[in-house]
């Protein structure tokens, strides 16, 4: 089982490494991953071999505090805010004491006057420095208590380095002051009180800036948590009462009025309303909800009145699960961070050894003074920064997963985030992924003497009693065009063939070609067009009255508006795109042509999809699988990265590494783009961290002193250390500016993309006047609809003739733009002259 613990007392990457080592050493613990920024640890353990109490005890034995996250009632983010405010107060008072300390100790070097009583005696001058230094050390005593505690436990951390550096300066200065008081020193000795105080103050400045920056990395999680309402209205025993949102129980009836937030997942049992689901699905338009419809936590009832039965409450709501996924992802570790983790575990002992070795070498080999050697040792201790190494990866991952969630992409682990950027083959399921997963009417061809409106009226009327998906596609098309339907009698469905019924006393047949032949209907006049539709992967339905063919309709699972653009973006990024489907080859090839997929694997049984993915992996491909159905789950697990379309089934989403909440294929390309951006950021952070420590430590040790006479002052070293962590975190925060290059596009834009797939370079020069032949217009309402669509194009003036079935378009516009606009309006362009 996996359980989250809240860990206190960690200050750097070395701390998190020690905590992970302590918990991971217990028998029965499979993995322990610490999130330094959130102060949490996610442990995967066998409860039969080890208990949560033993895990807590192991962490506490290492000098840190630990509690089960379920036992911590206070909001972690509020605790972080309180800790930041406390650190700010500590910093302010440290600076208040540091300014006079710096003036007293260093002012005379700058020609600044000192009070007479300080210049009268060297001892008075030294004591005054001590007086202002001690409050700074007391204010920042945590560096010493934690640092030395961890040193004695043989798990030194960054606090240990600061404590050793400041203590060395303080101890040397105290000894020199005692010698001065005893008269053993003539003149003013070299003291390091200001260095000890400055080191603590500057490190606190850096930690404060770092904590502020780290707080911004969790803004996405905080924003999600803010979506949940604090209270709700519950109806119990017929009486309404306001209760805290966390007190809602499963089965409670929750009342949500206009403008109210829905606090839990549930099902509408009374009322109706328009619900804004954009925070969860990204859908910009409100969704109508009525009795029986599901609703999701954190969504807003924009209008109407809803009563819903709570089905998922507390930690089980959709919002809570999203937050949990984000926290788990930010707590996980990417493979790219392994080297940094290994170095962080031994970094502090190595630095302590380098500091001691440098001081001894300068003393015994270089023949330098004690003050020189002490300055070198302190500088090495305080310039080194394990935090820069430890923060290089997690801050980028946390910002990246948060940014992904803002765009409707839920990434479950850092490993998935890293792998998505390295994927070179994307396998797409067809139905519900590339296509809408719902048949729609695409074409209408009426026989001579029959209008399209008449054909559609007859077709929808006879299909209305049927529950078949193709029948529903026909009736929905008629309803969208506001065509009135007629009642039929003697309705009969013939499995595998079609339906027949009586309309206005005439027997109507509707179905496939075989069904028509069986009932003596001649479909030969339409055979050429029906074959063309079939080649495009469409299902052809014929309609006949009293043995005479009225016309035919084509129904198909239409391509999603952004599929072509998304696939084009994937191909531009160097990915090989494969369409994997159980559908027949003809239909699969037709869809592939529309969206620009070059490789199709069709007629694959559900149980064989995983084998197809495995075969691609054996070819050396890093494979991402995108699907939405239960039959896609094994393939999602087999793939290096599994992506589930958000509208899919629970089992598919559970099997996936990444969940696309908007059900948009464009988000596959966006996930890959974001992953690559995060990887770039991590590499930059790691380079800076390694470069800083690789250069800073030798310089502090004095390697430039023999040639250039350059020796780093401990105060400057402390400032550099503070800024190094801030630089890493600030660089990661740049990811907050990331925006997806590939966005969901309109149907018009998608149609234009499809038209251009065959020959992207074949763009026509715009002409001033064109005549467009349009199919599908049946009334003046259609005329107005088409004119509005065409006139919306920039610089275009269009006039539509219903009788001729044409539109005259004037203006500088390409054929592709005209086709896109007309098709988006729901009609078909047959030709442009």
What are these regions (language model features)?
Residues 1-124, 223, 238-240, 320, ...:
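Flexible metal-binding regulatory segments at protein termini and peripheral loops
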Residues 98, 198, 346-347, 374-390, ...:
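Small-residue-enriched core segments of transmembrane alpha-helices in multipass membrane transport
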Residues 54-75, 127-231, 235, 246-254, ...:
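Actuator/coupling domain of P-type ATPases
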Residues 230, 280, 339, 388-462, ...:
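Conserved catalytic phosphorylation-site environment of P-type ATPases
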Residues 17, 38, 503-505, 539, ...:
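Conserved ATP-binding TGD loop and adjacent catalytic N/P-domain core of P-type ATPases
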Residues 110-124, 152, 171, 403, ...:
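Membrane-embedded alpha-helical bundles of multi-pass transporters
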Residues 89, 299, 421-467, 497-578, ...:
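ATP-driven catalytic headpiece of P-type ATPases
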Residues 76-96, 146-169, 323-355, 373, ...:
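Soluble-to-membrane junctions at the N-terminal ends of transmembrane alpha-helices
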């Amino acid at each position: 089982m996996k359980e989250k613990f809240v860990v206190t007392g960690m200050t750097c990457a070395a701390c998190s490494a020690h905590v992970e080592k302590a918990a991971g050493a217990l028998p029965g613990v499979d993995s322990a991953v610490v999130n330094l920024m959130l102060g949490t640890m996610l442990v995967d353990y066998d409860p039969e071999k080890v208990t949560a109490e033993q895990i807590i005890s192991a962490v506490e034995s290492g000098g840190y505090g630990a509690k089960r996250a379920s036992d911590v009632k206070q909001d972690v983010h509020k605790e972080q805010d309180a800790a930041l405010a406390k650190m700010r107060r500590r910093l302010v008072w440290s600076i208040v004491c540091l300014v006079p300390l710096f003036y007293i100790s260093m002012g005379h070097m700058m020609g600044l006057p000192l009070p007479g009583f300080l210049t009268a005696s060297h001892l008075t001058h030294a004591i005054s420095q001590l007086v202002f230094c001690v409050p700074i050390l007391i204010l920042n005593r945590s560096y010493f208590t934690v640092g030395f505690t961890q040193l004695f436990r043989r798990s030194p951390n960054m606090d240990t380095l600061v404590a050793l550096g400041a203590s060395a300066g303080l101890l040397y200065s105290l000894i020199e002051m005692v010698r001065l008081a005893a008269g053993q020193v003539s003149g003013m000795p070299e003291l390091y009180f200001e260095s000890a105080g400055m080191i603590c103050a500057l490190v606190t400045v850096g930690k404060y800036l770092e904590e502020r920056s780290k707080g911004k990395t969790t803004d996405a999680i905080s924003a999600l948590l803010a979506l949940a309402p604090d209270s709700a209205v519950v109806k119990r025993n017929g009486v309404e009462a306001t209760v805290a949102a966390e007190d809602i129980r499963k089965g409670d009836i929750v009342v949500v009025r206009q403008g109210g937030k829905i606090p839990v997942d549930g099902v509408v049992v009374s009322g109706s309303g328009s619900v804004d689901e954009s925070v969860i699905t990204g859908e910009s338009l409100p969704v109508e909800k009525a009795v029986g419809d599901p609703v999701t936590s954190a969504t807003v009832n924009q209008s109407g009145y809803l009563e819903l039965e709570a089905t998922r409450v507390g930690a089980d709501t959709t919002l809570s699960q999203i937050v949990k996924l984000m926290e788990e992802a930010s707590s996980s570790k990417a493979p790219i961070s392994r080297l940094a983790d290994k170095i962080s575990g031994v970094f502090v002992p190595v630095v302590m050894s380098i500091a001691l070795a440098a001081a001894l070498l300068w003393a015994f080999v270089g023949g330098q003074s004690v003050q020189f050697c002490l300055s070198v040792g302190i500088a090495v201790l305080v310039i080194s920064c394990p935090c820069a190494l430890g923060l290089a990866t997690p801050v980028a991952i946390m910002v990246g997963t948060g940014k992904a969630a803002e765009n409707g992409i839920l990434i479950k682990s850092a490993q998935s985030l890293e792998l998505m950027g390295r994927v070179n083959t994307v396998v797409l399921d067809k139905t519900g992924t590339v296509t809408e997963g719902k048949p729609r009417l695409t074409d209408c061809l009426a026989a001579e003497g029959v209008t399209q409106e008449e054909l559609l009226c007859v077709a929808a009327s006879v299909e209305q009693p049927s529950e078949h998906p193709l029948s529903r596609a026909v009736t929905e098309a008629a309803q969208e065009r506001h065509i009135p339907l007629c009642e039929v009698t003697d309705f009969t469905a013939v499995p595998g063939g079609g339906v027949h019924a009586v309309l206005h006393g005439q027997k109507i047949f509707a179905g496939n070609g075989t069904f028509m032949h069986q009932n003596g209907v001649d479909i030969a006049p339409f055979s050429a067009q029906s074959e063309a539709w079939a080649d495009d992967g469409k299902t052809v339905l014929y309609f006949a009255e009293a043995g005479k063919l009225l016309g035919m309709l084509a129904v198909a699972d239409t391509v999603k508006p952004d599929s072509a653009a998304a696939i084009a973006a994937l191909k531009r990024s160097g990915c090989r795109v494969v369409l994997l489907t159980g559908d027949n080859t003809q239909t699969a090839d037709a869809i592939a042509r529309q969206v620009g997929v070059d490789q199709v694997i069709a007629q694959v049984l559900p149980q064989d999809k995983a084998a197809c993915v495995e075969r691609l992996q054996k070819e050396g491909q890093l494979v991402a699988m995108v699907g939405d159905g239960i039959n896609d789950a094994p393939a999602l697990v087999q793939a290096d990265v599994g992506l589930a379309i958000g509208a899919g089934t629970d089992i598919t989403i559970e099997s996936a590494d990444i969940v696309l909440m908007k059900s948009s294929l464009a988000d596959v390309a966006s996930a890959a783009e974001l992953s690559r951006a995060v990887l770039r950021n991590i590499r930059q952070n790691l380079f800076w961290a390694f470069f800083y420590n690789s250069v800073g430590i030798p310089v502090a040790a004095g390697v430039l002193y023999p040639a250039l006479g350059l020796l780093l002052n401990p105060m400057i070293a402390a400032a550099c250390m503070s800024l190094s962590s801030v630089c890493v975190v600030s660089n990661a925060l740049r990811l907050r500016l990331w925006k997806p290059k590939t966005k969901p596009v309109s149907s018009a834009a998608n149609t234009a993309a499809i038209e251009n797939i065959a020959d992207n370079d074949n763009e026509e020069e715009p002409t001033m006047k064109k005549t467009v032949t349009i199919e599908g217009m049946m009334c003046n309402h259609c005329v107005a609809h088409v004119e509005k669509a065409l006139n919306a194009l920039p610089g275009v003036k269009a006039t539509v003739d219903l009788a001729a079935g044409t539109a005259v378009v004037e203006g500088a516009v390409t054929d592709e733009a005209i086709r896109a606009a007309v098709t988006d309006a729901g009609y078909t362009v047959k030709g442009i002259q």
